[in-house]
Structures are given as C-alpha cells and as structure tokens.
C-alpha cells in the first residue's frame, strides 16, 4: 500500500475519531436489507433532526474509537455498520432509530456512545423512551409555573367573591 493511501486512511480515522469526540451521541446500526427508499427515508428523518448518518468500515470505526478513548466496542463493530452522529441532542438519534427499527425488521441497533460513555442496546433503548431536552424543559417550566398559576386562580376567586358581595 502506498504512503499516500496510508496517509489518506489515517486522515479518515482522525476525522471519524474527532466526530466521535464532538458528538453527544453516536449510535451504530446494521442497515443490511433496507431498500434504497427506506434508507432515504431514514436519512431524511435523521437529517431533519440535525443528525448525520455515515456508513463506515469497521476497521476505521475500531481505530477511531480507540483513538477517541472509547474502549470495548469491538463487539459493536461487526458486520455492516452505519453510525448516526448527533452533536446537539443525545436522545434524538436513539428515538428516531428505535422508532424506525420497531417498524422495520431490517434495521437493528448494535450499540453506541452517549454523552461520552459507551452504551449497549438496553441503554440506547432506555434513552429512546426519554422525552427530548425541549420536552423536559417544558415540563420543568410547567412545574415552576404551577404554584404561580394556583395563586392567580385563588386571587381571582377572592376577587370574584368580593365583587359578588359588593353587588349584593
């Protein structure tokens, strides 16, 4: 193999390692058996959520994971592998891929990295059931607003009662 080819492969490994480090979530799937239309649909769903799906050779993934400091992923990088990288939302890739896998037997989740930790299939499935960050923030805001809303209703009830008494 020429020095140029080796340098090119090393650059790809470096690029994938950097992408693994920068991503809050990287889910590895086996998409063997998916039709072109199904892959296109999956890519569109992921792209709409800001997630990149790349098909990467297992040897490149193994070396990149080691370089990025993620050990113990050799059993994940077996067979055809595609990786969904998300730099913003750790939950979105797991949700989208699990939903797609539930409706399509040809897609299987193999493992991945979530928030800098190696994640097995069970962990990824657990993440897939969590609400998104925006939903969690909305729930939190609702909980903060609940006491204020209760006070407002109580004050309104007192004001209504007072106006009824004044009218009578």
UniProtKB/Swiss-Prot annotation:
CDD domains found in the cross-reference section: Ribosomal_L10
Domain of life of the organism encoding this protein: Bacteria
Keywords from the named record: Ribonucleoprotein, Ribosomal protein, RNA-binding, rRNA-binding
UniProt keyword RNA-binding present: yes
Gene3D superfamilies the record matches: 3.30.70.1730
Single GO term (MF): large ribosomal subunit rRNA binding
Keyword Endoplasmic reticulum: no
GO BP field: translation
InterPro entries from the UniProt entry: Ribosomal_uL10, Ribosomal_uL10-like_sf, Ribosomal_uL10_bac, Ribosomal_uL10_bac_type, Ribosomal_uL10_CS_bac
Cellular component GO terms held in the UniProt record: large ribosomal subunit
PANTHER family: 39S RIBOSOMAL PROTEIN L10, MITOCHONDRIAL
Subunit structure, as described in the record: Part of the ribosomal stalk of the 50S ribosomal subunit. The N-terminus interacts with L11 and the large rRNA to form the base of the stalk. The C-terminus forms an elongated spine to which L12 dimers bind in a sequential fashion forming a multimeric L10(L12)X complex.
Task performed by this protein: Forms part of the ribosomal stalk, playing a central role in the interaction of the ribosome with GTP-bound translation factors.
Protein family per UniProt: Belongs to the universal ribosomal protein uL10 family.
UniProt-recorded name of the protein: Large ribosomal subunit protein uL10
Organism ancestry: Bacteria, Bacillati, Bacillota, Bacilli, Lactobacillales
Primary gene name: rplJ
